[in-house]
A protein has these predicted regions:
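Solvent-exposed, well-ordered amphipathic alpha-helical segments
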Residues: 8-11, 28, 32, 36-37, ...
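Short aromatic-glycine-(Arg/Gly/Cys) micro-motifs in beta-strand/loop hairpins
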Residues: 1-17
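A short, charged, amphipathic alpha-helix used as a generic interaction element across diverse proteins
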Residues: 21-46
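Surface-exposed loop/edge segments in extracytoplasmic proteins
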Residues: 13-19, 50-54
């Protein structure tokens, strides 16, 4: 089972870790809800650093 890392992007383009989850649908849902709530872009990254998805607010 792989870990998914949810990261958010600040106004200067830097990416910062928010949290880790194991279940991909739940990680996507969390990223989507938080992107909508904060108005900031979020992305899902695996442990090897590969970007799996980018969520726009």
């Amino acid at each position: 089972m792989t870990k998914l890392i949810i990261e958010w992007q600040n106004q200067f383009g830097g990416w910062y870790r928010f949290q880790e989850q194991h279940h991909e649908p739940s990680a996507y849902r969390t990223g989507k809800q938080r992107a909508k709530r904060t108005g900031k872009r979020h992305r899902l990254v695996d442990t090897d650093g590969r970007v799996l998805d980018i969520v726009e607010p």
